[in-house]
Design a protein with these regions (language model features):
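Gram-negative bacterial Sec-dependent N-terminal signal peptides
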Residues: 2-21
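Flexible, low-complexity junctional segments that flank or bridge functional domains
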Residues: 4, 20-223
Length: 223
């Protein structure tokens, strides 16, 4: 059993998993919950960190350098395509990356929760923007390109650059549906449902989601 599955099993013993709930259309960012760490997560974090730093087959020091690696992995789990967060967001939190080890040891996962909450806000803004783009006339006559894998690309420096990326994403989604034989009305209806569903999912997240992602970043970095 590798570290990831060991850690998942440990978390299952100590943590209480939240449940998704039905929500209506989300139209305001204040309808997205601001997630906070729960008591059981602090306990699990302390125990898991202690266990792995003492007994893991791969010896490692949970120092500033290793903390930075965990931070980078967590960041990319949150925004793999580098099309949600801004470069300034990343820079703001990167200043705290050396704190990751101390947070895992103490069980006070402030950085993980703060960054997750910001990514939720940014993701809401992106899908709201995508819904507005859907209202524009569709035009497939240009020679636009869309980079499907932006995992190595820099984060957008400003909102204009971010909007340009999402203009491309929406056009790609539209074209993909057009190639299946859907007309413009069907394309708009399909994507409207898809983007609104993505927004509703944001409102269904809970503290367990943040904790699980933080533990995943930690586990994968030591495997």
């Amino acid at each position: 059993m590798n570290t990831f599955f060991k850690l998942t099993a440990l978390a299952g013993l100590f943590a209480i998993t939240g449940h998704a709930f039905a929500v209506d259309d989300i139209t305001r960012v204040d309808q997205i919950p601001v997630l906070k760490e729960e008591t059981q997560h602090a306990t699990v974090s302390e125990r898991v960190t202690s266990r792995f730093t003492r007994s893991h087959y791969r010896q490692f020091d949970l120092d500033q350098a290793f903390s930075a690696k965990i931070f980078d992995r967590y960041l990319n789990l949150l925004d793999y395509s580098h099309n949600v967060l801004l470069a300034s967001d990343v820079e703001q939190f990167a200043k705290r990356k050396s704190e990751v080890g101390d947070e895992l040891r103490s069980g006070k996962l402030d950085l993980f929760y703060d960054l997750y909450n910001l990514s939720q806000k940014r993701r809401f803004e992106r899908y709201q923007y995508a819904l507005k783009v859907l209202e524009r006339p569709m035009d497939f006559t240009g020679n636009d390109t869309f980079n499907l894998d932006r995992s190595k690309a820099p984060w957008p420096k400003d909102e204009a650059e971010l909007n340009a990326l999402w203009d491309g994403k929406v056009k790609y989604d539209e074209l993909s549906l057009k190639l299946t034989g859907k007309d413009e009305k069907e394309i708009r209806e399909t994507l409207n449902r898809r983007y609104k569903f993505a927004i509703r999912r944001l409102a269904q997240t809970n503290s367990e989601d943040v904790f699980s992602l933080a533990m995943t970043a930690f586990a994968h970095e030591i495997d």
